[in-house]
């Protein structure tokens, strides 16, 4: 596999942006064990590749364990990820848990299965992290995913809420990180093509695609074509919030304002807006308890081993 200078610039950009996100949000610290969730899509392949490259030259020591969850979907090519992960030399685990049957049992035919499937998958990931002693869980969401989620919540949920680059799980046991938070989907797709990753289709479950997310994505791409850099600016706004110029009384004490107490941006009082010259670019439920870990596959020095583990 030969690469051009354009590829090396792309690779450098992705590594630089990922390293910056890790530093800005304190995603990975010395001594961490990071469970890298692998779906078989372009995002997770890119995330693992970049994290492995950064690990080699990082000033801190941290451990990577790649994980794939085989949800027993019909037609899932279960050999693809183990073969790829073995070729990289990374420590990995393959977890089999039949979430597919539970989803099919619970969700009526024709209805979207994504919500329940996601919840069950999340439960298995958390339990796997605990089993392996991983304190960080890395997901492959990128900048475009974060912006897309921001508009989904605003349009359909009435909230200014996106995907945080870093958050604690509800029980406080793990930290979830999104190392690709500064990376564009366009760059990730180009990198995945150049690296010839063995991509696994994402439609094996037969569930209807999230039409709302698709529409928002199409809207954003149309904006980007008309005004290149717009997605960068939207993402930049998520990192440059001014509570006093919104309308959330929980974020800013509007009732306590009085003359002579605070300076304000007077232009905004009269509806004026200041624009930048250039776009800103930033380098456990009962169902869960039914799941059983059928297999842990990890590559030892000679051959893979199989362990039995159950969820209590």
UniProtKB/Swiss-Prot annotation:
* UniProt keyword list: 4Fe-4S, ATP-binding, Cytoplasm, Iron, Iron-sulfur, Magnesium, Metal-binding, Nucleotide-binding, RNA-binding, Transferase, tRNA processing, tRNA-binding
Binding of [4Fe-4S] cluster, residues? 114, 117, 205
What else does the entry mention about this protein?
The thiolation reaction likely consists of two steps: a first activation step by ATP to form an adenylated intermediate of the target base of tRNA, and a second nucleophilic substitution step of the sulfur (S) atom supplied by the hydrosulfide attached to the Fe-S cluster.
Per the Swiss-Prot or TrEMBL annotation, the motif PP-loop motif is positioned at 39-44
Instruction: Quote the protein name from its UniProt record.
Output: tRNA-cytidine(32) 2-sulfurtransferase
Chief subcellular location: cytoplasm
Look up the EC number in the record and give it. Answer: 2.8.1.-
Q: A GO term (biological process) for this protein?
A: tRNA thio-modification
- Quote the pathway field: tRNA modification
- GO molecular function list: 4 iron, 4 sulfur cluster binding; ATP binding; magnesium ion binding; sulfurtransferase activity; tRNA binding
**Where is it found, in Gene Ontology cellular component terms?**
cytoplasm
**Names of required cofactors:** Mg(2+); [4Fe-4S] cluster
Q: Which Gene3D superfamilies does its entry note? A: HUPs
Q: Which InterPro entries match?
A: Rossmann-like_a/b/a_fold, TilS/TtcA_N, tRNA_Cyd_32_2_STrfase
Location in the cell: Cytoplasm
Q: What Pfam families does the annotation carry?
A: ATP_bind_3 (PF01171)
């Amino acid at each position: 596999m030969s690469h051009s200078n354009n590829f090396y610039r792309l690779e450098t950009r992705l590594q630089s942006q990922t390293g910056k996100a890790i530093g800005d949000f304190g995603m990975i610290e010395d001594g961490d064990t990071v469970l890298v969730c692998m779906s078989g899509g372009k995002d997770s392949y890119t995330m693992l590749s970049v994290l492995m490259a950064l690990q080699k030259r990082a000033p801190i020591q941290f451990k990577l364990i790649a994980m794939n969850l085989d949800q027993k979907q019909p037609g899932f090519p279960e050999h693809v990820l183990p073969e790829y992960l073995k070729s990289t030399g990374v420590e990995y685990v393959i977890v089999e848990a039949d979430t597919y049957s539970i989803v099919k049992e619970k969700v009526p035919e024709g209805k979207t299965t994504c919500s329940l499937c996601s919840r069950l998958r999340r439960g298995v990931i958390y339990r796997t992290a605990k089993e392996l002693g991983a304190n960080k869980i890395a997901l492959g969401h990128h900048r475009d995913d974060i912006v897309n989620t921001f508009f989904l919540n605003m349009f359909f949920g009435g909230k200014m809420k996106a995907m945080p680059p870093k958050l604690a799980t509800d029980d406080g046991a793990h930290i979830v990180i999104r190392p690709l938070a500064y990376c564009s989907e366009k760059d990730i797709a180009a990198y995945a093509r150049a690296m010839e990753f063995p991509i696994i289709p994402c439609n094996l479950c037969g569930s209807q695609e999230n039409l709302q997310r698709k529409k928002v994505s199409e809207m954003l791409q149309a904006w980007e074509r008309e005004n290149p850099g717009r997605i960068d600016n939207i993402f930049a706004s998520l990192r440059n919030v001014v509570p006093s110029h919104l309308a959330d009384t929980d974020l800013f004490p509007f009732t306590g304002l009085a003359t002579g107490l605070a300076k304000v941006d007077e232009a905004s009082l009269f509806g004026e807006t200041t624009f930048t010259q250039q776009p800103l670019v930033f380098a456990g439920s009962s169902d869960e308890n039914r799941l059983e870990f059928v297999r842990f596959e990890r590559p030892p020095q000679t051959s893979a081993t199989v362990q039995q583990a159950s969820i209590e």
